[in-house]
């Protein structure tokens, strides 16, 4: 009975949120409270123990840091410089737009900021170069989605937090990189094939794009760029060294010390001390709606785990679906779910616990393949 109620609560949260535009996370928190206190015998204090504190802090702190680069125009000017330097290659415009969006998103801008910066540029440039604006916008969409999956960017941070919740802390770095690599390669292949088809069916464009020379990076923007690069080096250096030298103790220690959330807070404090942005503007751009949506669904899914629902679903999947077809199954399910809900706040928090259960029951199943298939399926229809 409790399992059916939790499934209904998940479906209702998504359905009501989709129809009424009420934040799905708020609905999930409300359902979690009602289910936990009336059906599972948990007190409100015990329910709060299921709140994904680590995930909440990481998303908040990293978005806070990269809001510095957004508010002072660093990311926008960087995008303009890259476009200006590639203006003599109009036939590669779709690829250039894709790579720029991927780079900006991977640098920490995340999906929505990258779309806001690059989509207007993409449409304008496609019209000037006699290219299809819809394909240009889709190239930006793919690039923003793939780049955000880097472990130091928006979506990648969420996945890292979810992996640690699943008990995959030692594998989180590898799992995140696997998702990132696949999610930028497969759209790249599609765009290459599309570009080749257009080139040979419509011919080459020999003229250069007319793009105004962008402004020089100001002192504030140069300092912001340096802080972004420094934070990525701190977060990436020791995990990479640990992969190469896994038995050196001091590398292992520092790998655990440089947490991206706390590094981001240090960088925010330094940025504010250097007056690289206004604190009020930086705080105002924190994506509270996404944070609430993600944490609320994670709370509801934690109750599903505690009730045994996730274990039951995992057992049903492993006993009814051949292991060979599991990646395709998760890819399709994630794609269908993503048509009506968010990849970060619904699809990943719902399916990752099921993958964890399947992995526990059948250790030989490759969780990298299942998690990557899930995200690729979701991104294909987002």
Protein language model regions, located:
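Hydrophobic transmembrane alpha-helices of multi-pass small-molecule transporters
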Residues: 1-58, 66, 181-312
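Hydrophobic, membrane-inserted alpha-helices
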Residues: 8-14, 97-102, 140, 228-232, ...
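Short helix-coil transition sites and intra-membrane helix breaks within transmembrane domains
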Residues: 19-24, 54-55, 66-76, 104-117, ...
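Small-residue-rich segments of transmembrane alpha-helices in multi-pass membrane proteins
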Residues: 32-39, 91-95, 145-150, 289-304, ...
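Short amphipathic alpha-helical coupling elements at transmembrane boundaries
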Residues: 49, 77-87, 123-128, 268, ...
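Alpha-helical transmembrane segments
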Residues: 54-61, 143, 175-190, 255-257, ...
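Hydrophobic alpha-helical transmembrane segments of multi-pass integral membrane proteins
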Residues: 58, 88-123, 134-137, 320-367, ...
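Membrane-core helix-loop-helix motifs of multi-pass transport proteins
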Residues: 123-218, 366
